[in-house]
Amino acid sequence: MKNKFLAIILVIVVTSLLNAQDFSIARLKYSGGGDWYNDPSAEVNLLKFVQANTNIKVNAEYKFVDIASDEIFSYPFLFLTGHGNIVFSSDEAKRLRTYLESGGFLYIDDDYGLDKAVKREMKKVFPGNDFVEVPFSHKIFSIFYKFDNGIPKTHEHDKKTPQTFGIFLGNRLAVLYTFEANPSDGWADPEVHND
């Protein structure tokens, strides 16, 4: 169950790609003091799950890219997580906006304590766009596995209801943000969280 939600996201992103290369995810390295590097086994385990349960060919290696680098344009799927603060310079915000407007996808998982920074910094990226709650009727909750009640809670923090937010560019979900759910903790090696 922990991996299924992001498997849905991967299916959506990958099926929209025309490139025949193996699919991979890059962790987005950012400034500001948040631990962008936490749980490095998460993406590798998720990609292995996707490979074992779908027809998607993956490259299950841990990769990270600096937000200031043009290398972000080499990956259709960027992942941002951590605890604490995030800061985008104006150039980084512009680069991320160009990436997303060019068809890239960003998944943000609040591992705890990122909410204010995520909302503040994404306003630099898209000043005219707010995060909106993704309705349970959206295909992301049913394209591969069915989640009638939205994203499941993986890691308990504050006993709040898990929520899924998005920034849409036209009809396309370009940024997905999970809050109070923390599915990436469920992808990490079991010994990381002792569960």
Language-model segments: what does each one mean?
Residues 4-15:
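Sec-dependent N-terminal signal peptides
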Residues 19-77, 81-84, 182-183, 189-195:
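Aromatic-Pro/Gly-enriched surface loop or interdomain linker
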Residues 20-21, 70-74, 100-101, 166-171:
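Extracellular/periplasmic catalytic domains that process cell-envelope and extracellular macromolecules
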Residues 21-23, 32-33, 41-42, 115-195:
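An acidic, glycine-rich "communication" segment
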Residues 25, 77-116:
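Short alpha-beta junction capping motif
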Residues 49-57, 81, 98-102, 121-129:
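Structured segments of extracytoplasmic/periplasmic soluble domains
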Residues 56-65, 108-111, 129-136:
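Surface-exposed patches in mature extracellular/periplasmic domains of secreted proteins
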Residues 60-67, 89-95, 159-163:
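Alpha-helical scaffolding within the catalytic cores
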